[in-house]
């Protein structure tokens, strides 16, 4: 997840058509404290932009029944802002989701963690070391890792071996602190051409190779639907290496119900698996403004009833 990608998400998307959610759009604002959701769906800054700044949005999310929060850019924020966010979440009994531990240089197609330059791997490990303090300030357990880009001059197998090796070294850094790095596979068809890790199954293979509780896979279902599809069987096959989940519908990368993914069935399967982790709402709102925020809440109420 890049800063530019998050900026796009938090800005909101232009409406591409009305989707009936079966819930009145004004219902979300009617109650000051709504019942808590049954799963830990995590909005992000911008999900409720009309309600104020980051702290105000956290308070509003809690009042609407959300029990978690996600902030990809938390590691880049001043320490005082990190501390304030952690305090706000603690006061609302909310769980902190992921932040990005090592941000790729998207426009440069770097780093090449499986390439020939050890300096790129050392830079990545330095980011991981710095992220330990961030995680402690935020009271976060999971941090997102993007395993970089492909080196088209090298065999994929060589790159896989090197990425397994560098992730083992990273695990040695975070495991003593009981932290988990979740590797995020990204789609190459729409958003991120050239990345190394392109599917949950590929992430599963790397995680198995690392063989550490500190290295798992982030199952972003928006990316997986574009790249591979077959979502529920993939989740089942890779379940023991999945450490975190993110939602987002396709096309459009907006809230559930705006695209082709049957999120009610996904939720049923997560319940059957007794999934108790955070589910990041890493997507935009299809409709701008307060009406779009109400639709967002209604969309999650609809799938949470599944």
Locations of the language-model features?
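Conserved radical SAM core fold
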Residues: 104-109, 150, 188, 248-254
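Short glycine-enriched loops at secondary-structure junctions
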Residues: 47-49, 100-104
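Glycine-rich, aromatic-flanked loop segments that form ligand/cofactor-binding clefts
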Residues: 93-101
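Catalytic domains of carbohydrate-active enzymes, especially glycoside hydrolases
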Residues: 57-74
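Glycine-rich, proline-tolerant flexible connector loops at the mouths of alpha/beta enzymes
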Residues: 71-90, 147-151, 191
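Active-site acidic/histidine proton-transfer and metal-coordination neighborhood
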Residues: 12-14, 33-35, 91, 111-216
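Histidine-acidic metal/acid-base catalytic patches
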Residues: 2-42, 47-62, 140, 197-219, ...
